[in-house]
């Protein structure tokens, strides 16, 4: 509201539309995971081994992007409900058709931790498939591939998701209770400590 009142709202930082935009991006990623990595699709017709490596990289990038968009949604819309439970966001783990999307009751909010677990699983898959770095002058895996996800980028996003999930503000009320601005009470030290150790 402050940003809107001060004239700081632009087409690039307007929160209206974030939900649908992110789920559209997730649908593109899921469509690619389901259709873009099959044997019928070739990215290098002259060398089957290079084609295989490209597909592995693209699969890793897809898992990275799916985790990225879920995390963006989680940062904006995840949090505690009135009942004290930390809620996540509906997970898009497959391509969602218009008919399926029309069934609003089918998309329930999992817990915050279940959402983080989904994100972390996608990032673990990405870490396995992505290259460490892009170096050399190779057309597909060389240093001209600027801005592509790497193992390190996936590991950083994973650590951030785990850090957010360990925050006292994102714990159920039976683990931590917020008592004021920046103040909280730990009700279940074992669970609280375990989340921080996971980071």
Regions found by a protein language model. Give the residues of each.
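Hydrophobic side chains in beta-strands
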Residues: 69, 93, 161-163
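Conserved, well-structured interaction surfaces
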Residues: 2-79, 102-142
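Aromatic-residue-lined binding/catalytic grooves and analogous aromatic/hydrophobic interfacial grooves
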Residues: 1-5, 30-38, 116-140, 148-199
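Short coil/linker segments at helix-helix boundaries
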Residues: 46, 77-109, 169-197
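Short, solvent-exposed turn/loop segments enriched in Gly/Ser/Thr/Pro and often Arg
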Residues: 81, 146-148
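Short coil-to-beta-strand
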Residues: 24-28, 87-93, 158
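Extended hydrophobic secondary-structure segments that form protein cores and membrane-embedded regions
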Residues: 59-63, 91, 154-155
